[in-house]
């Protein structure tokens, strides 16, 4: 392998990626301190070299001239005076091109700027001692696409946005492969800054600054680039997380295969538009959860279109984190419940908001709908704030007295099943697990009121309306518990569609809109009626413990967990279970993900038809 110019740039000890030890760069690459990229800046501001047959570098006619290559600096775009050690140009002979379409995430991969195929660096024998997985600051052409028939690799200077993106991608990948419960959010001081400091020379050709001002700059960069990074500035109220762990940052798009370099040629641009490639950022509209996620994507969208969409007062909804719910949100408490809202694409005449008669008036709820995530997870808002939910929303840790969390989706008819594994149950801790209706008290144990039914770890007692009865032996750490419910399909609840919430008030919290619903607990309790032929059954390590309850109260039931002190449990909504029941037929709770989307969409459409919203010519408060 022959290297062009003065030789390779910043060197590190042998070994690719995070295993390499950093060393100092050359004097030609020194800068006083890095500056955060401006709004909208990213890898696209550092264009890749486009070699041509007419370009040549002194000493080798087959190597490209990189003396005019542009790169990011604190003063914007500057032209390098020479190749020096500020970049690496490698031109190597390779026997064949990797034709595999599969990715090797976690390895140093390179994307060809012409054919857009991905290759591992080992395919061409490229020295990766100064490289990291998920890097974006390079230009690469495979030996088939390059005019010389050799492989072209140029390592460029990275701006802070690219460095933060690479750091978070590597931290996310490490957590996925090493942690039992992978994280998606990482502490600025404990995770991100130490990672960048350790691998600075692997992440950029820029000289490590003498002044320690770059940590503040990376925080500003990630806080500003909300189309790429998630930001959580403070722990949830009542959380045990120490305040010094915050702010925390994560990637908005958790698909790490979307991370790649930014090439200027049109072929790469079109490929990025189609695939939603991060290219140092996230393509506008490529992510976003909820029922309208796919519809929001603009095929062949342009920057002008994106800006226009953002200025729209109705459809300027914020993009959601990977798990489908805002990091900072209102909690269901004090007699009020909050349902995340998104623009309803089927609502007629959304332009009416621009009329003068709507100035200063609340946005009508019929223009929005409940925002549903297609996966069943533990609810972030429908829980006691002191409970700690894992990043994947499948594990919960208790805190002090009994408190409860419900799942994001509930069932109104049919037979359903889910599992819970007791991960940790220290002495003097306990759990009550089972099913709850939406009005079940979150600051009380499951089974406290008429709206919930539970199974306690101690002595296996079952609870409903705070009345405990012997049911089975208890359970503890390591046990896998199953929860089955069967609701008849001939009840009024079963035949009804879910609430559209369109008649509820819309409130704004941290840039997101929510429907606000008042709880009428006393009225709901008086209207409860038993449902014949309904039943709840619990399982312990695959063994049926018998029918716990029959003829339960009619309603919509959610999987629910209540914990006493620092007990930790994980929930599995399916479709694969460790101990699937063999004596019953059922649907896994995971099926309710798309099932709820269908039900709510039908309810929304019927609402528009039945209320004749299209014919409304004035606000509802006007005659």
Curated annotation (Swiss-Prot):
Changes after translation: Both monomethylated and dimethylated on arginine residues in the C-terminus. Arg-291 is the major site. Methylation is not required for nuclear localization, nor for MLL complex integrity or maintenance of global histone H3K4me3 levels.
Gene3D superfamilies cross-referenced by the UniProt entry: 2.60.120.920, 3.90.980.20
Keywords: Chromatin regulator, DNA-binding, Metal-binding, Methylation, Nucleus, Phosphoprotein, Transcription, Transcription regulation, Zinc, Zinc-finger
Subcellular location: Nucleus
Domain of life the protein comes from: Eukaryota
Compositionally biased region (Basic and acidic residues): 230-247
Entry comment describing in which tissues the protein is expressed: Ubiquitously expressed, with abundant expression in the heart, skeletal muscle and kidney. Low expression is seen in spleen, lung and testis.
Biased composition (Low complexity): 36-56
Region Disordered, annotated ranges: 1-99, 230-326
Chain residue ranges for the region called DNA-binding: 63-172
Modified residues (Phosphoserine): 96, 311
Entries under InterPro entries matching the protein: ASH2, ASH2-like_PHD, ASH2L-like_WH, B30.2/SPRY, B30.2/SPRY_sf, ConA-like_dom_sf, SPRY_dom
Composition bias type Polar residues, residue spans: 84-95, 265-277
One Gene Ontology molecular-function label: zinc ion binding
Biased composition (Gly residues): 1-18, 278-290
Assembly with partners or alone: Interacts with HCFC1. Core component of several methyltransferase-containing complexes including MLL1/MLL, MLL2/3 (also named ASCOM complex) and MLL4/WBP7.
Function: Transcriptional regulator. Component or associated component of some histone methyltransferase complexes which regulates transcription through recruitment of those complexes to gene promoters. Component of the Set1/Ash2 histone methyltransferase (HMT) complex, a complex that specifically methylates 'Lys-4' of histone H3, but not if the neighboring 'Lys-9' residue is already methylated. As part of the MLL1/MLL complex it is involved in methylation and dimethylation at 'Lys-4' of histone H3. May play a role in hematopoiesis.
UniProt-recorded name of the protein: Set1/Ash2 histone methyltransferase complex subunit ASH2
């Amino acid at each position: 392998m022959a290297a062009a110019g003065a030789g390779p740039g910043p060197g590190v000890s042998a070994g690719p990626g995070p295993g390499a030890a950093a060393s100092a760069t050359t004097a030609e690459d020194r800068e006083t301190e890095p500056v955060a990229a401006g709004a909208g800046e990213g890898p696209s501001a550092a264009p890749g070299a486009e070699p041509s047959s007419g370009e040549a570098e002194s000493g080798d006619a087959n190597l490209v001239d990189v003396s005019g290559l542009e790169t990011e600096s604190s003063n914007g775009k500057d032209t390098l005076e020479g190749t020096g050690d500020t970049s690496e140009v490698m031109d190597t002979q390779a026997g064949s091109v990797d034709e595999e379409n599969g990715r090797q995430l976690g390895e140093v991969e390179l994307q060809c700027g012409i054919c857009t195929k991905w290759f591992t660096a080992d395919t061409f024998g490229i020295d990766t001692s100064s490289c990291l997985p998920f890097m974006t600051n390079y230009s690469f052409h495979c030996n088939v696409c390059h005019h010389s028939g050799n492989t072209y690799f140029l390592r460029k200077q990275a701006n802070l946005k690219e460095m933060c993106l690479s750091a978070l991608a590597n931290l996310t990948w490490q957590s996925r492969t090493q942690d039992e419960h992978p994280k998606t959010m990482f502490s600025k001081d404990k995770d991100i800054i130490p990672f960048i400091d350790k691998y600075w020379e692997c992440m950029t050709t820029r000289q490590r600054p003498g002044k320690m001002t770059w940590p503040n700059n990376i925080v500003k960069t990630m806080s500003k680039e909300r189309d790429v990074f998630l930001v959580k500035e403070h722990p949830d109220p009542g959380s045990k997380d120490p305040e010094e762990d915050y702010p925390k940052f994560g990637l908005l798009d958790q698909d790490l295969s979307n991370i790649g370099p930014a090439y200027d040629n049109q072929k790469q641009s079109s490929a990025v538009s189609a695939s939603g490639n991060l290219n140092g950022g996230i393509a506008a509209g490529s992510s976003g959860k909820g029922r309208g996620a796919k519809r929001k994507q603009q095929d062949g969208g342009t920057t002008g279109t994106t800006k226009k969409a953002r200025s729209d007062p109705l459809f300027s909804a914020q993009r959601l984190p990977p798990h489908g719910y805002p990091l900072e949100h209102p909690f269901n408490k004090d007699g009020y419940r909050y349902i995340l809202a998104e623009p309803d694409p089927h609502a007629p005449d959304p332009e009416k908001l621009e009329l003068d008669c709507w100035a200063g008036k609340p946005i009508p709820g019929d223009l929005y709908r409940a925002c549903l995530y297609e996966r069943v997870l533990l609810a972030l808002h429908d829980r006691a704030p002191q409970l700690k939910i894992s990043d994947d929303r499948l594990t919960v840790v208790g805190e002090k007295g009994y408190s409860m969390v419900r799942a994001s989706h509930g069932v109104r008819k049919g037979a359903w099943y889910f599992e819970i594994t007791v991960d940790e149950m220290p002495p003097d801790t306990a759990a009550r697990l089972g099913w709850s209706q939406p009005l079940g008290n979150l600051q009380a144990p499951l089974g406290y009121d008429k709206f919930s039914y539970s199974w306690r770890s101690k002595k296996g007692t079952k609870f409903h309306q705070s009345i405990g009865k012997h049911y089975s032996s208890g359970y503890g750490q390591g046990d896998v518990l199953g929860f089955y419910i069967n609701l008849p399909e001939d009840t009024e609840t079963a035949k009804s569609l879910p609430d559209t919430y369109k008649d509820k008030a819309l409130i704004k919290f941290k840039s997101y809109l929510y429907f606000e619903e008042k709880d009428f607990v006393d009225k709901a309790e008086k209207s409860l009626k038993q449902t014949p032929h309904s039943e709840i059954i619990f399982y312990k390590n695959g063994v049926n413990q018998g029918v716990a309850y029959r003829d339960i109260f009619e309603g919509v039931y959610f999987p629910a967990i209540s914990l006493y002190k620092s007990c930790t449990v994980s929930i599995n909504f399916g479709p694969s279970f460790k101990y699937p029941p063999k004596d019953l037929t059922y649907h896994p709770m995971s099926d309710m993900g798309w099932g709820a989307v269908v039900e709510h969409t039908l309810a929304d459409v019927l609402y528009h038809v039945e209320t004749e919203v299209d014919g409304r010519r004035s606000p509802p408060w006007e005659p």
